[in-house]
Amino acid sequence: MIETIILAGGRAERFGSNKLLAELNGRPMVLHTALRLQWDRRFRVTVVTCHDAVRKLCKENGIACIYSEECLKGLSGSIRAGVRELAEKGAEEICFCAGDQPFLTADTLAAFHKAWQASGKPMGSCLAGDDPTNPAIFSKDCYPALLSLEGDAGGRRILSARPEDCFFWPLPNPDEARDIDTPEQFLKEQPV
């Protein structure tokens, strides 16, 4: 079972409101990847958030949720909250996905995980073109580094500090890494 955290604690400043709740094709954005992965038995999904409405959506849809005010301290707060809880439950590795990347498929994430495992590296990141992007995965050896992150620093800080320890995997379809940060991007994704 692949332990997967969906990071859903952001402030969505460029969007103007909580984009994770914006309905994309009839479903709140945060639920697209969460439900797609949860329905696939290869994954155990946990959403990390500080938003009451996201927590309520998770509860209504049977998705595990870590509610933490630490998310208000930036991306690192969400990562720390998730790592602490899953490490206590014995997770050997954690895969991180973004709540605003609704196009990621379970098959892509499973293929990334399989290739990462075969690499023997302690951490891995997908590539969209030449750019590292979510999802990213970290073995338990990386938990101390993840727990030491501060502010809006995410796993990319660790990946860039230790590239020799990182497995980089080109996404077969880089469109799956698209995130939605602005209302204009959101409107482009709506059916006509």
For each feature predicted by the language model, list its residue ranges:
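N-terminal glycine-rich phosphate-binding loop and ensuing alpha1 helix
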Residues: M1-D52
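Conserved beta-strand segments of alpha/beta enzyme cores
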Residues: L20, R44, A64, P122, ...
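Conserved SAM-binding loop
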Residues: A22-E23, V47, Y67, F96, ...
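Short aromatic/basic micro-patch
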Residues: E23, F103, I137, F168, ...
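Conserved beta-loop-beta/alpha segment of the NTase-like Rossmann-fold superfamily
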Residues: L72-P144
